[in-house]
């Protein structure tokens, strides 16, 4: 279990992605994920250790999973809602996100909402990073009686993928 801590109060602790599907290649870039909270919302941070990430899509809601992409799937309140959010972002900062019951049943999110996440990407020689904030007010649009509690346990998954990259990986 991963304890979500208050932003800028504790040293960052990362979850590292270690499991990849066998795609017939050995491409398994190291990915670190961290999530913290503040009075504004949840702050997600990824370190992706790959050089020259493939990033063809530039607009929110494009199929960014085809690019070099990181994904966070999260139930913000599994007791009040059986739906989860999927946040998928590529190295251009383009995000695909919606509120899902499952793969086929989902509620769309507006471009204005995605713009409020303040997505920041930084690409360096052998690493790229992604930072964004999910405001509590955004969550309340979909989970009406959502109330953040400091010691909440969030069910979530973190992924790295690239369907159309030089070395397909999941």
Which functions belong to the PLM regions below?
Residues 1-170:
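Structural preference for beta-rich elements and adjacent junctions enriched in aromatics
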């Amino acid at each position: 279990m991963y304890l979500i801590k208050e932003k800028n109060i504790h040293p960052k602790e990362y979850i590292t992605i270690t499991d990849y599907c066998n795609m017939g290649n050995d491409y398994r870039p190291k990915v670190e994920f961290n999530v913290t909270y503040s009075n504004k919302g949840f702050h997600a941070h990824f370190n992706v250790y790959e050089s020259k990430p493939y990033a063809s899509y530039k607009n929110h809601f494009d199929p960014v999973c085809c690019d070099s992409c990181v994904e966070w799937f999260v139930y913000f309140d599994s007791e009040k809602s059986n739906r989860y959010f999927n946040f998928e972002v590529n190295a251009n900062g383009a995000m695909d996100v919606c509120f899902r019951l499952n793969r086929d049943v989902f509620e769309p999110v507006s471009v204005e909402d995605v713009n409020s996440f303040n997505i920041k990407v930084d690409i360096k020689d052998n690493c790229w990073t992604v930072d964004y904030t999910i405001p509590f007010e955004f969550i309340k649009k979909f989970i009406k009686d959502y109330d953040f509690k400091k010691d909440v346990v969030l069910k979530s998954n973190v992924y790295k993928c690239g369907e159309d990259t030089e070395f397909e990986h999941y």
